[in-house]
Amino acid sequence: MQVYGCCELVRELYAQIGSGDQAYVPQAISCAVRALNDVAADESLPKDVREKAAFAAANLLISDFEDK
């Protein structure tokens, strides 16, 4: 997926990180898994949203990519 396929909020933060206005997180996979886990655990959100986040987090965890 490329940034142009993402929502406006993601594109805005991408531009801010690229320009140095927002912090870059070197261990981005771990950051993404933590964020997805927070969404999946939030019982105030609709179940389908939580399930999508859990599915994405599980796939990242099982992938062979590791943050160094």
Swiss-Prot record:
Domain of life: Bacteria
Official protein name in the record: UPF0253 protein VIBHAR_03255
Family, per entry: Belongs to the UPF0253 family.
Pfam family, any one: UPF0253
